[in-house]
Amino acid sequence: MVRKLKTHEQKLLKKTDFMSWQVDQQGKQGDMLRKFYVKKREHYALYNTLAAKSREVADLIKNLSESDPFRSKCTEDMLTKFYAAGLVPTSDTLERIGKVTGASFARRRLPVVMRNIGMCESVKTASDLVEQGHVRIGTKLVTDPAFMVTRSSEDMITWTKASKIKKHVMDYNNTRDDFDLMD
């Protein structure tokens, strides 16, 4: 017979669900969560499942015969989409898709791309700035740090017009216009 839980033990176990839990690689996943500053573990689990599914599809396409026109069309389409999303460095062979991991998806998050292009010093700072509404992509304001940035939209990442950070950067670079001072 099991004893009745004390009050503090019940409070600790209140949010624990013993019926459904995810089996994952705690050590490696924790490192990736810290490296890419992913706040929700479910997001990284989703990236891993997307990578696994894409590897499965790539393996299915590889199993088709070389002379099959469907194989060449699917290979070309899949490589084009993965290259446009920024998940593979070049779109030459199907083996590139076989090497896609959850980290490949995490590298395309907006804060990580901002750090890579030099807008911020760290991913954490970039994530905070995105959540506070300082960043836009094209004309669209983005406040979700889990936003996936494609290669084409990578060049359109800028500070919002009303952002104080943009004003400080323009003052530092001596590029602030008199017209901008009126805003």
From Swiss-Prot:
Gene Ontology MF annotations: rRNA binding; snoRNA binding
Subcellular compartments: Nucleus, Nucleolus
Keywords annotated in UniProt: Nucleus, Ribonucleoprotein, Ribosome biogenesis, RNA-binding, rRNA-binding
Nucleus among keywords: yes
Classification of source organism: Eukaryota, Metazoa, Ecdysozoa, Nematoda, Chromadorea
Domain S4 RNA-binding, chain residue ranges per copy: 108-174
Record note on quaternary structure: Component of a heterotrimeric complex containing imp3, imp4 and mpp10.
Nucleus recorded as keyword: yes
A GO-annotated cellular component: Mpp10 complex
Name of this chain's protein: U3 small nucleolar ribonucleoprotein protein imp3
Role played: Component of the U3 small nucleolar ribonucleoprotein. Required for the early cleavages at sites A0, A1 and A2 during 18S ribosomal pre-RNA processing.
